[in-house]
Amino acid sequence: MTLLMIFTILLVASSQIEGHLKFDIHDAQHYFETFIINYNKQYPDTKTKNYRFKIFKQNLEDINEKNKLNDSAIYNINKFSDLSKNELLTKYTGLTSKKPSNMVRSTSNFCNVIHLDAPPDVHDELPQNFDWRVNNKMTSVKDQGACGSCWAHAAVGTLETLYAIKHNYLINLSEQQLIDCDSANMACDGGLMHTAFEQLMNAGGLMEEIDYPYQGTKGVCKIDNKKFALSVSSCKRYIFQNEENLKKELITMGPIAMAIDAASISTYSKGIIHFCENLGLNHAVLLVGYGTEGGVSYWTLKNSWGSDWGEDGYFRVKRNINACGLNNQLAASATIH
């Protein structure tokens, strides 16, 4: 049975109530068995399967509630549907300000702090819609797996697009180099994007993924400076109150690594998110564009949960409502040599 057929079965088995996707909780066992086939889930014993079903059923109820609240976004069963919220945040995010106990950090390079306090300049002629995916400036969506390396993926994603803008050529850069060699962050236990940029300035450069492939676990640092694909010349940390100020920075500086609260987006499928938790920052993503659809203005963000999540690995949130906690002091970007 193909993936498309299985998804069709799920959608037919569910019902549309007032335009919203709603699953019949009485059919939760059916949805769960289909989910197991769809995502090739394997549980070691019946006890574990029953435990996962309990979580799955709770997530179904949560999906129904989200679909009721969000009139321009759809939530659905996906690969995370048998995980609790705590499991998702522990294994699949990774934003943290904690530092390794044995941290060795050079003080030679720091990001400049940029305050975007002034209202957007009305004379700036910015396009109504913008997206760095246009003209082939974004690499494919990656999957961090069960490693809290979102910070590395967001930082590296920024640099990949900057390289494409400068050279009109896409390359995949190495998140694993940061996981193994960045002594100021905590590998799969989390980190910060601006700190990653600072550490890359200190290291001298970043290798390509083909030369330093992703493992999703911390290993011995294997930097080879003869294989650096680029170097980071400077970086910025943004402090802003008005989200609209990000539009000009996005266009002139390139994609911006952003911190969000990902607690309520795990089952996102498509559309523009209106209602999103903002209880604490825990995940890093990449701001790549903005636009308007159906009268709703939105930001487009690239995630690191694989292309089988969301809108081919991307998601959209409504602009100017601090959706998912976007208004924070951890946004960062860089420039390259």
From Swiss-Prot:
Q: Which Pfam families match?
A: Inhibitor_I29, Peptidase_C1
Keyword Signal applies: yes
- Record EC number: 3.4.22.50
Residue pairs linked by disulfide bridges in the UniProt entry: C147-C188, C181-C221, C276-C324
Which GO molecular function terms does the record list?
A: cysteine-type peptidase activity
PTM details? Answer: Synthesized as an inactive proenzyme and activated by proteolytic removal of the inhibitory propeptide.
Which controlled-vocabulary keywords does the entry list?
Answer: Disulfide bond, Glycoprotein, Hydrolase, Protease, Signal, Thiol protease, Zymogen
Give any single GO term for biological process. proteolysis
Q: Which residues are glycosylated?
A: N172
The cross-references to Gene3D superfamilies, in alphabetical order and at most eight, read: Cysteine proteinases (3.90.70.10)
Propeptide at 20-126
Q: Which InterPro entries match?
A: Papain-like_cys_pep_sf (IPR038765), Pept_asp_AS (IPR025661), Pept_cys_AS (IPR000169), Pept_his_AS (IPR025660), Peptidase_C1A (IPR013128), Peptidase_C1A_C (IPR000668), Peptidase_C1A_papain-like (IPR039417), Prot_inhib_I29 (IPR013201)
Annotated CDD domains: Peptidase_C1A (cd02248)
Q: Which family does it belong to?
A: Belongs to the peptidase C1 family.
* Name of the molecule in the record: Viral cathepsin
Name its species: Adoxophyes honmai nucleopolyhedrovirus
